[in-house]
């Protein structure tokens, strides 16, 4: 579906959630693994740095499809909303790339800090944030006992905080790890275990934080939200009045940064004047740079943000193929056995309400061993489709990247 050329109907808003140092106790009761088929949308952003997390995030969201008002992959029902973790996907690709001798277009050494930078917020995964924010991050490489891993590779991924565990690759084993490391918020693995799957990389991220300035439930009202196809739906719109905070309202963007409790993690809400298809990583980066703490301009604001919750199950094979980690990738730094990457998936969810935000993602890569003997004054209202990105307030590193096309849809 094409978008209206009326600027009021074609503006979207990006909400980049920059992680704040305090977590919000949200009552999340139904953040479970997505039941839908895998979303296979992937739009490569050519001419951009493929190790850049904003580039990865926009590619995974399928920016061209969003501009057309389309949902997920062509072989499944359309969804107006998507959430991905660029950090989870990039970390999975980076750890696998450390074992590759074939050409890849990402730089693992540059991606590694994006996985390890959240250690100061480490805690148990929860859907009820407390006085301080929690970012629970865990990972492992599960290896069949018959598959020898090179010591050099083992040493390399230790720097990623990725231990190697020896054990049979079974559905029960993978499911148990996912449930344990997401506090039960994701119910099981997204991989389909096959007889030739001998190595599995798993990582999990759970984020929970309270707003520094919470929205008042009594102020939440029904409000019009214009979807990508121009139709209008009614949403639960939360409001902040006389709110002093960072904003932008020029050069093709309206936006605001909403901090979590210690101001180190934040939500960046960005509403582009142009169609979604015209949003590039460069334009997005320029807008974000005006909201980070070093460059912020503040004012008294009136802010409207819809409540939303949804899940996405994402097929990452398009992304892996694009960066040189397709089935033909040579992983000879990892093991001398013939191997191929056979599955790559991510399950993600996000919940935003008056108290704060809870989000999570599980990223998994299944590697097969070949069958051989070797075996206020300014009003900013998110009343049309927007991006919601979770990251830190200083750099806006995108831990989670969401597109919200209809807040009423789960």
State where each predicted segment sits.
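N-terminal secretory signal peptides
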Residues: 1-8, 19-26
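N-terminal export leaders
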Residues: 10-15
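C-terminal motif of bacterial Sec signal peptides marking the signal peptidase cleavage site
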Residues: 29-30
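Bacterial Sec signal peptide processing site at the extreme N-terminus
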Residues: 33-41
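Post-signal peptide N-terminal segment of secreted/secretory-pathway proteins
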Residues: 67-135
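Non-catalytic, conformational "gating/processing" segments within enzyme and secreted inhibitor domains
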Residues: 79, 118-273, 298-372
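Extended hydrophobic
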Residues: 201, 254-270, 375-410
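Internal alpha/beta scaffold segment
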Residues: 263-265, 272-297
């Amino acid at each position: 579906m094409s978008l209206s050329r009326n600027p009021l109907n074609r503006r979207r808003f990006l909400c980049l959630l920059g992680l704040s140092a305090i977590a919000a106790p949200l009552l999340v009761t139904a953040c479970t693994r997505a039941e839908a088929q895998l979303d296979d949308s992937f739009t490569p952003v050519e001419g951009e740095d493929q190790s850049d997390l904003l580039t990865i995030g926009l590619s995974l969201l399928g920016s061209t499809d969003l501009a057309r008002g389309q949902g997920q992959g062509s072989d499944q029902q359309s969804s107006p909303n998507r959430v991905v973790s660029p950090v989870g996907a990039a970390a999975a690709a980076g750890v696998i790339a450390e074992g590759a001798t074939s050409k890849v277009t990402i730089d693992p050494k540059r991606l590694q800090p994006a996985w390890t930078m959240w250690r100061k917020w480490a805690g148990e995964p929860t859907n009820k944030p407390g006085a301080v924010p929690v970012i629970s991050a865990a990972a492992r490489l599960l290896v069949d006992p018959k598959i020898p891993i090179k010591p050099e590779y083992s040493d390399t991924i230790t720097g990623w905080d990725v231990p190697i565990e020896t054990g049979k690759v079974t559905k029960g084993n993978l499911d148990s790890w996912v449930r344990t490391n997401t506090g039960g918020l994701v119910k099981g693995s997204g991989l389909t275990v096959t007889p030739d799957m001998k190595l599995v990389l798993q990582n999990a991220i759970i984020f929970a934080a309270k707003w520094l300035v919470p929205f008042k439930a009594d102020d939440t009202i029904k409000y019009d939200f214009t979807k990508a196809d121009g139709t209008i739906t009614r949403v639960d719109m939360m409001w902040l009045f006389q709110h002093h905070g960072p904003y932008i309202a020029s050069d093709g963007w309206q936006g605001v940064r909403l901090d979590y409790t210690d101001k180190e993690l934040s939500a960046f809400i960005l509403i582009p004047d142009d169609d979604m298809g015209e949003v590039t990583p460069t334009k997005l980066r320029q807008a974000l740079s005006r909201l980070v703490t070093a460059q912020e301009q503040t004012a008294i604001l009136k802010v409207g943000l819809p409540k939303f919750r949804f899940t996405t199950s994402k097929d990452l094979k398009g992304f892996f193929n694009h960066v040189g980690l397709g089935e033909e990738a040579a992983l000879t730094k990892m093991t001398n056995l013939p191997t191929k990457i056979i599955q790559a998936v991510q399950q993600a969810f996000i919940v935003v309400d008056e108290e704060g935000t809870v989000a999570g993602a599980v990223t998994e890569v299944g590697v097969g061993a070949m069958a051989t003997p070797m075996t206020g004054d300014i009003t900013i209202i998110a009343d049309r489709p927007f991006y919601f990105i979770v990251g830190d307030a200083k750099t806006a590193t995108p831990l989670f990247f969401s597109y919200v096309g209809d807040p009423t849809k789960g």
